[in-house]
Amino acid sequence: MNVYYHLPGLFEFYEFYKKFLPLFKNKTEYFYDWCKIGSVYGSPSDCIWSGGRISYADCDPKKVFALMKEYNISSRLTFSNSLIEEKHLSDIKCNELCRLLSLDTNNGIIIHSDLLMKYLKSKYPNLYFVSSTTKVLTDFNDFEKEVENPDFTYVVPDFRLNKQLEKLNSLSESYKPKVEFLCNECCWYGCKDRKECYKSVSRQNLGIDCMGHVCKAPFSKEGYRFSRVMENPAFISLEDILNIYVPMGYSNFKIEGRDLGSALLLEFILYYMVKPQYQIHVREAMYLDAMLDLF
């Protein structure tokens, strides 16, 4: 079974992917044989339909979508704002992005709002839909109902369902290909404010004057540290993917990080996708040379 990774930073890391994707295509011996890129997701700046994160990326969408099409990779717009109202549906920029995206039937939308999905289904029928993790589906029954919804091609559950292995194993075999696990979530496992955090981002993307959410989680002041993420009870390691999830019939895994630096994105790729003996080769191809100084 192939494993499909859904990578962050469609717009945010455009320059990174311009350099990385030729490497992924032409140096196949560097990467695990079973490893595929299912999609790259993100959004440009100033999109009121955006959710999950606030993007500051400013790339030409035609070039972005063309790059992904060249390598037969699905582009996904993260239009997961949870506070969309009827008045927001006519937004010119977001509609134009969807029009461009829908020129290729391989592309999709990560979505939260039912109102927005109904609108997009009618206006851009070529697009597929991914149920966003911003819904914070922590109850397995709610998650199962979401997976059963034919409107969704994929569903990203809350990361705290990642290790409910007995229930995941019992899920219908026909639904398992729809499940997309978030592997490297940095959010505190005991967080009670996850929904409110995402709502705050939705308000800001809509241009509403509001206070940003203040994270109260332990170690929040440290920022994202992959080493600490690996200690999260919900973390899905490479070994977990190969030894637990793939044998159960799961094949889709999401990597977060579009608001991080490209150095961390490379570390995620090295960890999940690159054979250990070739990790130095990938570093050298991407940035490392004999004259690079760290300090």
Can you say where each PLM-predicted feature lies in the sequence?
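Solvent-exposed alpha-helices and their adjacent loops that cap or buttress functional pockets
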Residues: 147-149
